[in-house]
Amino acid sequence: MTKPPRTYRTLDARPSGDSLIKPGELVDVVEVTPLTLADRRIYNLLLENAWDAIDKPVTHVIAKTLLRGSHNSNDRIGASVERLMSAIVKVEVVWDGEPAIERVQLLGGNIETLRSDGLLEYEIPSRLRKIIRNSTVFARLQREVMFALTSKYALTLYEMVQKRGNLRWRASDRFTLEELRGILGVPKGKLTSWSNLKLRAIEPAVAEVNQLSDYVVEIAPIKTGRRVTHVELRWWKKDGEGQGAAERELASSRVGREQRRKEAEAEADGLKPRPAWLDAKGASLQTTTYETARLRFPGYDIYFVEAEWRAWAATREAPRDADAAFLAFFRTYAERHPL
């Protein structure tokens, strides 16, 4: 009789000198207190340090020098630990036969010696140990990429893609805007409009992940009526040439890397073609009109605003000069939706 296939557990995966393992349940984390880039890096290092006994009821010890990175002060370590203690992960579970949500702290009790070259002793909460023990999906994070990414949004997006990249028959995932804000750790009251979220968080994160990781990533808006309510995250593995380019970027200086990314973004902005789905909404405007809009209203998605204009104009009399009408609408739109 054929044996059933063995379920591969996250705990079976082993970290290496170049990479570390993060259970998938700890990637899409909803933060009560927004975490910083340093917090996220430190937490990944704490998980790696505890990995061999991470599902056991034991304490773990790590040298603070391993958590400081290039920062010379221990103050940041203590602040990061406290924020991690207040962060939670929400996991969908079944309780007494009913769907339920389990909420678990990311980090348990700990003690930190005050010496700059001292130690941090910490615990993994019992409920979290159980979640990790039962985990079957994980992200393998390249250490070099983790330390090269310059924003918490980029690191979070990288983890999201690494968690999903090896899933069979799946190359996209959908989130509400609120879900995405929660996972990215956007502070409450910040980046509340789609245009702000896209410009300040999503686009820079996508650009960094595309530049430095093994995957190409896209985040596309999905509208309900006239509002963007969801996004679709898409990913695909780079070919050999693309992976080689990412490795060369990682080997280059950060200053040069940032400059090349900005140049690539500027070139993409100038050459970005009109999406095909807009053809169904009306004929293309003059090329000079799009260029004028790009120069007058930098940072806005020109074609998204065109779609908004066409939806608004659909119930009105056709303008005599569509190009002038679009630019007038764009001016009003920018005033009402500042970046």
Which stretches of residues belong to each language-model region?
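Intrinsically disordered, low-complexity Ser/Thr/Pro-enriched regulatory regions
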Residues: 303-304
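Charged, alpha-helix-forming regions
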Residues: 1-279, 286-292, 307, 311-339
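Short, mixed-charge amphipathic alpha-helical segments
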Residues: 291-300
